Amino acid sequence: MALSFTEKKRIRKNFGRIPEAIEMPNLIEVQRESYEAFLQMNTPREQRTDDGLGGVFKSVFPITDFSERATLEYVSYEFEQPKFDVEECVQRDLTFQAPLKVRLQLVVFDVDEDTGARSVKEVKEQECYLGDIPLMTDKGTFVINGTERVIVSQMHRSPGVFFDHDKGKTHASGKLLFAARIIPYRGSWLDFEFDAKDVLNIRIDRKRKLPATTMLYALGYDTEQILDQFYTRSIYRLDKKGWITSFRADAWKGVKPEFELIDAKTGKSVAEAGKKITALKAKRMAEAGTDEILVTSEALIGKFLARDVVNLETGEIFGEAGDALEEPIIAEMREYGIDSIEVLDIDAGGRGPWLRNTLKADKNETRFEALSDIYRVMRPGEPPTQEAADALFGQLFFDPERYDLSAVGRVKMNMRLSVAVREYESAADNMRTLRNEDIIGVMKVILDLKDGKGEVDDIDNLGNRRVRSVGELMENNYRIGLVRMERAIKERMGAVDIDTVMPHDLINAKPVVAAVREFFGSSQLSQFMDQTNPLSEITHKRRLSALGPGGLTRERAGFEVRDVHPTHYGRICPIETPEGPNIGLINSLATHARVNKYGFIESPYRRVKDAKLTEEVVYLSAMEESIYSIAQANATVNDKGELVNEFVNARVAGEATMIAKEEVQYMDVSPKQVVSVAASLIPFLENDDANRALMGSNMQRQAVPLVKSEAPFVGTGMEAVVARDSRAAIVARRAGVVEQVDAMRIVVRATEDLEGSKSGVDIYRLAKFRRSNQNSCINQRPIAKVGDVVSKNDIIADGPSTDLGELALGRNVLVAFMPWNGYNFEDSILISERIVRDDVFTSIHIEEFEVAARDTKLGPEEITRDIPNVGEEALRNLDEAGIVAVGAEVKAGDILVGKVTPKGESPMTPEEKLLRAIFGEKASDVRDTSLRVPPGDAGTVVDVRIFNRHGIDKDQRALQIEREQIEKLQEDKEDEQSILERNTYSRLRDILIGKDAATGPKGFKAGKIAEAALEELTQRQWWEIELKSEKAQAELQALREQFDASIRELEARFNDKVEKVQRGDDLPPGVMKVVKVFLAVKRKLQPGDKMAGRHGNKGVISKINPLEDMPFLEDGTPVDIVLNPLGVPSRMNVGQILETHTGWACRGLGNIIDKALEEFHQKHDVAALKASLTHAYGDKQEMPETDAEIIELAGNLRGGVPIATPVFDGAREEDINDLLTRAGLDTSGQVRLFDGRTGVAFTRPVTVGYKYLLKLHHLVDEKIHARSTGPYSLVTQQPLGGKAQFGGQRFGEMEVWALEAYGAAYTLQEMLTVKSDDTAGRAKVYESIVRGDDSFEAGIPESFNVLIKEMRSLGLNVELLEDRGGAIEEEEAPVAAE
């Protein structure tokens, strides 16, 4: 395995012992594959399957009008190219989407008046536009109105049949009442349930219950057929001695006969009355030759007839099928001479009389009665007719339009009802509605359950829950839109002259477009992407939610649904889930898990044959897995791949046991297949308590990208995978050589995959200081240098939170575990001044401000520098167009964009009249509505974007921005063209040299072409040479055509982009111009910021200590951070201590390499440098080949040697000790520390080491807030609450008690009146302060008036009376001014 481009630069030493059986899959495949299966965009039209979009069209079309004179049929669909690419959509607040064109045929028929026969009159085919469909970006996200969104996959109950019981809660006796439910993908639910009287009932759509046999009558069975379906029969013949019946051993085993059984042949007693016949005894009786037994007439009493018994002469019925036999009936039958009767085998062989009891409780006896009953339940109040009842019943379960089990539901049904089938494929068939056999099968299973056979289903088993991913969710919403459209089409077909219209006249795409827009815009599963860092993006795309439409609600979800289930193993992470009300309802997919075509989550396993591992990897779902025994990934295996130990830890049907090695059928592929991506990034996860591991995985997602990313010393080996799959770093699309690099772009000349149609140049534009959804900063930096050779999928540029192609969420810092003057009490963190000074945890945040100039009733708003009553100082950062300059440093209250709004004519004040009289001009009639920096914000302007409406002249600033964009495009085009030309001409030279030329340009000699001859011509003239060899000439011609085509395509692409830059923007109605300003804010670490490790150890910074006061090591190095040791034992996250020790060793090894590198710079001995690397890594590690690469590697390792300790397979204690010894450090991991203030050593050694810490998104700068004067609520006139509203702090009930307790009456009075909601009092206080007078009078608070109004609305006339006895005049509350 050769080292990749980035691995050569920094090798991570891996402590894992278990080899990985398969590559880590692409982590966002779930999203991409699902949506591609829905669109089938890259599949040729002929090869498209009936899933996804095509399936939706086929299910809704053909649409026939009411008179059946015409049908609209679906042929195929195509996508056109999207109008704007992803980048342009983000900038212009558009949706990244492609137009959908559907080819439809309108078939018009001639209908014969007399016979009603139809013949085709004409067929009109046409392509119709059916709206735009949002496309997924290659990152697995959607750009909707300029923001990136993710569609989260939903877990829901799989369609199919489920059996359950009430756990004995319904009935007082604690008797189990069994129930079954058939759940379709869409359509009516059918429930079967036993009531307390042991009668089996059905419910349709949870309506009133009916006896289950009503359903069977409605299906067309009669009483005898129903009994035959569920019971076997025995025939009793009358003999001189009694009744004789055949003896079947299986029917009698476990039965206690009430009468003794006598062998009919021998006349001997073979079984006593009241004694249980065991299975063994029944078998022996059969073996002894007992094949018929004799019973008396009493033994028949209480048995049930299987057939009607009728007097054939008179037609008199002695007994109906299902009736119990009684003595008079038996006597009558003997009298009439009936000498054989058929009875049901009830209680024999363990079949209970439940269905026969249900039949007797059912009042219906014919199909029409049963159908009428069902009709009355479904449509109460309507009289049933034969046709209506028949039609309704057919629609409920047998009409594919209204009832769809789906492929999954059919597979699940077949698997549950037939015991033998365990594989999905063998259970699949195409019947999507119910069959009679299904309903009878379900009833048989529920009767078996009642008889104590079989098990009920576990709804939380992952075999019974499935995942709906993006594609399926979109498909369901699209179907809803199409069905709405179908109604409109049917109506329109009736209203127009069908002979003259074309398909597009009938189609109105609005309902479809609206359904799609609604799904992406407001569905609970369409979420604003968490873009804090690359890990949070990946985790968001791999999330599984049980909430959402058709799912659970937080309130209703019980404990069982949220709990970890044995089938989660290798499918859903048992660790990563939110804390709080959503715990267990929102989960994350495990690292290796994938979703199969039926929506079930599968986990990979290696096949084991005869205790030997094979290379074959099989994906199993929870259902399929239940019948195998599966060993763990850490089972000991020798070099030949054979299991060593006689007994192995394994899981059998979800239970952990020990089994013999020969019984093992499968084995886990990797120890980390159990956990999710976030949890697999926690080193020493196996040493952390689960609760803290949960916090650790959640907090990594909140880590803010720092100005300087640094990969962790102690990682798990997953860092590179996350960086690659999140697309935060830039990955090379194909192999090539780096031609040009600057901060903005990388140009690579491709060396493979050179097809005629593709350009031979890859240009990668880097994202510079872009704003993410969470206002963190997205900035990419190139790693590759000019001349570097890169392979496909190599990382050539780092993104936010990545370092040399590895995920880097935080920084490695020197930590000491010791108390320090109470500054680390209760998880507080003491940090050194160095951390702030060296910008270790500084991050950049980018905020976006937007201002729109609208066309108002009074006239258009204007963006301008000319703002009334604003001094020159406030305008210093604005250009002549009134827009802030890029690079300006602004603080709260500064103007970013000057804007004025016309205000209505107002009566002139005397002062204005005076001004008019003196200056003769009208005072300005506009007011200042400029965009200002909000309170609490400050920063540097990094970007300004201006959007103009079509047909409005652009200002200077907009034209300048446009010029810059076009220059960038021009530069890209020129570079691509020059590399194309270089490549083409070098290939042309190879074709020409040494060949025979027939003719050439002027002055060129025919004959063999030498290199010198070519040098004399210009490269353009080379094309004019004609070769004698036809083959060579054809090759030359092909090259020429390919080159011309590439140049044409390049020109077209460039012109298209330029045209997009130059044309106006689509702005909302009434908006003339929009200006967006982006502000970069540098946030340094400060007290109040939240920090955390990867083990759930979180805290808030309490103090920034001067460098000289920090505890220091013997060599004088002060520690960076002091943590409280009491935070470890009770939390049980010991992983952080192991990480600290290991990090300490990594740094020690780095110091050794650093010394070796300094020696190398003096002596230039590469061998010695190599030896120091081998000392650090051990001799098994593969190293780069060239000296330059070795030197670069050593340079990158000076800070510390990174190691990987994979989860559940990480470094052991002896590994850490060995690492510490190599680094020349004490294996205790503790050192003597000295007090920075006194210089005296602390009394005992302290644990010191390097630990990876993250700065979380909860920044004190974004939380702290203070209000001066601000907005008031309209009704209560109290200040608003919250930072967003610039609100105040509530002075609540308890605070009032505190002031009452102090006796501070006046303070309390002003708190509750003038400082809050006494409007008149507020104004008076302001006036008195202006006058310099400090007395004031409190009035009546507005909330008191609100209270009185509310009481009056309840009909209580409350008046406020003065002491003197007269009513106080209520002041009318003044209307709140703007």
Swiss-Prot record:
Its EC number is 2.7.7.6. DNA-dependent RNA polymerase catalyzes the transcription of DNA into RNA using the four ribonucleoside triphosphates as substrates. It catalyses: RNA(n) + a ribonucleoside 5'-triphosphate = RNA(n+1) + diphosphate. Belongs to the RNA polymerase beta chain family. This is DNA-directed RNA polymerase subunit beta. Keywords: DNA-directed RNA polymerase, Nucleotidyltransferase, Transcription, Transferase. GO terms for biological process: DNA-templated transcription. Pfam families: RNA_pol_Rpb2_1, RNA_pol_Rpb2_2, RNA_pol_Rpb2_3, RNA_pol_Rpb2_45, RNA_pol_Rpb2_6, RNA_pol_Rpb2_7. NCBIfam families: PRK00405.1, rpoB. The RNAP catalytic core consists of 2 alpha, 1 beta, 1 beta' and 1 omega subunit. When a sigma factor is associated with the core the holoenzyme is formed, which can initiate transcription. GO terms for molecular function: DNA binding; DNA-directed RNA polymerase activity; ribonucleoside binding. GO terms for cellular component: DNA-directed RNA polymerase complex. InterPro entries: DNA-dir_RNA_pol_bsu_ext_1_sf (IPR042107), DNA-dir_RNA_pol_bsu_external_1 (IPR019462), DNA-dir_RNA_pol_su2 (IPR015712), DNA-dir_RNAP_su2_dom (IPR007120), DNA-dir_RNAP_su2_hyb_sf (IPR037033), RNA_pol_bsu_bac (IPR010243), RNA_pol_bsu_CS (IPR007121), RNA_pol_bsu_protrusion (IPR007644).
